[in-house]
From Swiss-Prot:
This is Succinate--CoA ligase [ADP-forming] subunit beta, mitochondrial. Residues 11-238 form the ATP-grasp domain. Belongs to the succinate/malate CoA ligase beta subunit family. ATP-specific subunit beta subfamily. The gene is SUCLA2. Mg(2+) binds at residues 208, 222. InterPro entries: ATP-grasp (IPR011761), ATP-grasp_succ-CoA_synth-type (IPR013650), ATP_grasp_subdomain_1 (IPR013815), Succ-CoA_synthase_bsu_CS (IPR017866), SUCC_ACL_C (IPR005811), Succ_CoA_betaA_euk (IPR034723), Succ_CoA_ligase-like_bsu (IPR005809), Succinyl-CoA_synth-like (IPR016102).
Length: 413
């Protein structure tokens, strides 16, 4: 999992780092938006919906308001527009039909750019480290620019040990087309952004656009920052900023239980240890005509509690008609997984078929636990056979539902 912050929080981090950004304040009610607009004192303001999704500007709110980024010209208008955003769901291409709730808006001064540029820092495997990315074409979808004109994207790899050098930032600013009198200022902003990237264990910082504004100042008009979830233990300040209202409830529960979970569209639940084995398990389910309902990696040191929580996560998805547990016990002990399965099946009064494939450390103890439980858990030593079995069982349950038959795999028998 990666952490994404709201724009106003990202802009706050930039401001702390001494990077030029437009003045703005977050508002959580229309009345707050009115008050902030009045305090800013400008007749030109921008109201930005704070929703963790791309394409806000082209989105639509429930209630009919078009666009999650609006220009307003008075505190009264700021209040009126905010009232149509706050507490409403915004639907974009990225959110799909579920939409995402807007709980706050960012009220900021409007700046007039002479030119717009694109700038980002990300980790890239081909360079085995961080890379600066720039383009003279900012303020637009950079993926479209890359597809239509790949030469417009400039990359500058950074040696992770030596760090960024001023000549690298200057070279990139020149290639991006900054006027000669602003090259040094643009380069200084890039260096500050790189230092921010390292300080907070970011995996990406995207500024779109970075601009030369009408007063001749280089400014970052927007900021998107992603953080490495592995750094949560030392980036408490950052991870405490996470807005869980923007996440699926299952993602929240998975994070709480320290499980790697991603919900999918299928009907076969998967519980696996190890990301590689989890992906291979999903592949083999697809190979035999099934569709995985999730990616779920319990890791190498899962406890009975975590396995139970994993089952709760899987079964909270009402599309799930069968479950495949695939464990290769190296560090992970098979008997711990078996205890978790037995506890979960009993606690949840599970009525859907569970196929279990266990191999490795203490596998015989695990099989004995499952047998002694008296539960109808279907064991299989071969992964290919286990996948075929769970796909077939999901098809049986599907047919029963289509025929309006109350066919359940009663556990225990």
């Amino acid at each position: 999992r990666r952490l994404s912050l709201h724009e106003y929080l990202s802009m706050g981090l930039l401001q702390e780092a001494g990077i030029s950004v437009p003045h703005g304040v977050v508002a959580r009610t229309p009345d707050e938006a009115y008050k902030i607009a009045k305090e800013i004192g400008s007749k030109d303001l921008v109201i930005k919906a704070q929703v963790l999704a791309g394409g806000r500007g082209k989105g639509t709110f429930e209630g009919g308001l078009k666009g999650g980024v609006k220009i307003v010209f008075s505190p009264e208008e700021a209040k009126a527009v905010s009232s149509r955003m706050i507490g409403k769901k915004l639907f974009t291409k990225q959110t799909g039909e579920k939409g995402r709730i807007c709980n706050q808006v960012f009220v900021c001064e409007r700046r007039y750019p002479r030119r717009e540029y694109y700038f980002a820092i990300t980790m890239e495997r081909s360079f085995q480290g961080p890379v600066l990315i720039g383009s003279s074409q900012g303020g637009v979808n950079i993926e479209d620019v890359a597809a239509e004109n790949p030469d417009a994207i400039i990359k500058e790899p950074i040696d992770i040990v030596e760090g960024i050098k001023k000549e690298q930032a200057v070279r990139l600013a020149q290639k991006m087309g900054f006027p000669s009198n602003l090259v040094d200022e643009a380069a200084e902003n890039m260096i500050k952004l790189y230092n921010l990237f390292l300080k907070y264990d970011a995996t990406m910082i995207e500024i779109n656009p970075m601009v030369e504004d009408a007063s001749g100042v280089v400014m970052c008009m927007d900021a998107k920052i992603n953080f490495d979830s592995n750094s949560a233990y030392r980036q408490k300040k950052i991870f405490d900023m996470q807005d869980w209202t923007q996440e699926d409830e299952r993602d929240r529960q998975a994070a709480k239980a320290d499980l790697n979970y991603i919900g999918l569209d299928g009907n076969i639940g998967c519980l696996v240890n190890g990301a590689g084995l989890a992906m291979a398990t999903m592949d083999i389910i697809k190979l035999h005509g099934g569709t995985p309902a999730n990616f779920l990696d319990v890791g190498g040191g899962a406890t009975v509690h975590q396995v139970t929580e994993a089952f709760k996560l899987i079964t909270s998805d009402k599309k799930v008609l069968a479950i495949l547990v695939n464990i290769f016990g190296g560090i992970m002990r098979c008997d711990v997984i078996a205890q978790g399965i037995v506890v979960a099946v009993k606690d949840l009064d599970l009525k859907i078929p569970v196929v279990v494939r266990l191999q490795g450390t203490r596998v015989d103890d695990a099989k004995a636990l499952i047998t002694a439980s008296g539960l109808k858990i279907l064991a299989c030593d071969d992964l290919d056979e286990a996948a075929k079995m769970v796909v077939k069982l999901s098809e049986i349950v599907t047919l029963a539902k289509q025929a309006h038959l109350d066919v359940k795999f009663q556990l225990p028998i």
